[in-house]
């Protein structure tokens, strides 16, 4: 709670008025993007398909694209963190290109922003979709927002290590792990039909009574 309170009182974005445009959206969806390890293989085409379908039912939908979060103190690795943020931003731009009416949509890109700014933005979000593990810490664990978490079946065996409050997970039968020659749990990519994620998001929107 203290982190949330601090973020609410210390956000430069909020004090500048930059959040107001997004907060007028209904609903406001947080989309977590992974440009590095353990990613949803169809995240570009799949996320675009999900958003385009949601726009049919929710024309005032706003989207916050999240990605890499640099540590509170970057030290000598600031170049590395900028590079990782750019990877995520490249993925985000590919998704946005696939949204036909993007000129009239509300988007926010927060990949690379400090953790406190992300938490402040997360407090205004209605729901999220993101990787269940480290990719959703800010929105699911700290902001405690409802959402859909996706991960490989191999990672699902370790999901108890991650704190979630109201996150729906994808049925493991719909998840297909990508073979990793080194068999590293934390680096395994996975395939999921986008419709499985969309259906879970729709359930949450109905529960939230957002029309």
Predicted segments with their positions:
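A nucleotide-sugar donor-handling region in carbohydrate enzymes
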Residues: 1-39
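Leloir-type glycosyltransferase catalytic cores
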Residues: 1-11, 159-211
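Structural motif
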Residues: 30-32, 64, 129-131
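Catalytic donor nucleotide-activated moiety binding site of glycosyltransferases and closely related
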Residues: 33, 55-115
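Short, solvent-exposed loop/turn segments at secondary-structure junctions
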Residues: 35-38, 69-72, 135-136, 153-156
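Well-ordered, non-membrane alpha-helical segments in soluble/globular domains
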Residues: 41-54, 82-95, 122, 198
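Extended hydrophobic/aromatic segments used for targeting, binding, or gating
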Residues: 72-98, 149-151, 155-182
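A donor-sugar binding/catalytic signature common to diverse glycosyltransferases
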Residues: 118-161
């Amino acid at each position: 709670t203290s982190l949330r309170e601090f973020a609410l009182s210390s956000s430069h974005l909020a004090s500048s008025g930059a959040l107001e445009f997004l907060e007028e959206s209904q609903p406001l969806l947080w989309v977590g993007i992974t440009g590095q390890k353990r990613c949803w293989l169809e995240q570009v085409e799949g996320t675009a398909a999900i958003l385009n379908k949601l726009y049919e039912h929710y024309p005032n939908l706003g989207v916050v694209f999240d990605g890499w979060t640099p540590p509170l103190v970057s030290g000598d690795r600031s170049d590395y963190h900028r590079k990782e943020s750019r990877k995520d931003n490249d993925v985000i731009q590919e998704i946005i290109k696939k949204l036909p009416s993007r000129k009239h949509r509300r988007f926010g890109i927060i990949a690379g922003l400090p953790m406190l700014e992300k938490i402040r933005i997360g407090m205004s979000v209605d729901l999220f979709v993101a990787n269940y593990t480290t990719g959703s810490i800010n929105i699911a664990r700290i902001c405690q927002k409802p959402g859909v978490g996706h991960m490989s079946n191999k990672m699902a065996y370790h999901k108890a290590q991650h704190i979630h409050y109201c996150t729906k997970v994808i049925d493991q039968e719909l998840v297909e792990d990508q073979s990793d020659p080194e068999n590293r749990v934390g680096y395994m990519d996975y395939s999921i039909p986008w419709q499985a994620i969309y259906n879970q998001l729709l359930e949450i929107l109905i529960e939230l009574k957002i029309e």
